Regions:
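GST-like domain detector, emphasizing the conserved glutathione-binding G-site
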Residues: 1-111
Length: 111
């Protein structure tokens, strides 16, 4: 599912990262999860990996990193918490069975 500028969900990404970090920045995990379930999302691009982020961004992400996830009035940071939230909304990503859910979360945190 392509990025949809009108989608209710917004994921923050860096405009630029150095070659050694490409593919390893944690917003990729969130975007991948949304793509897997066909959930449209918009993308907010902020400065590069080593740039100081604007104060208004630090209110959403106190470490100045990515991603930040916004949906309606909800704002989350840290990819693990965002992935659990997305998984809670869609069983294809996070099983309801306690044992299976625990295994899925173990792999999610390890990744």
């Amino acid at each position: 599912m392509p990025v949809d500028p009108n989608a209710e969900i917004e994921v923050t990404s860096f405009k630029w990262v150095p070659p050694f970090a490409q593919g390893f920045v944690k917003d990729m995990r969130v975007r991948w999860a949304l793509e897997e379930i066909g959930q449209p999302y918009s993308e907010r691009l902020i400065g590069g990996l080593f740039e100081e982020q604007p104060q208004e961004y630090l209110a959403d992400q106190p470490f100045g990193q990515v991603p930040v996830y916004k949906e309606g009035g909800l704002t989350l940071f840290e990819s693990g918490s965002i992935l659990i939230h997305i998984g809670d909304k869609d069983e294809r990503l996070l099983p309801r069975d306690t044992a299976e859910r625990g295994r899925a979360i173990s792999w999610m945190i390890a990744a």
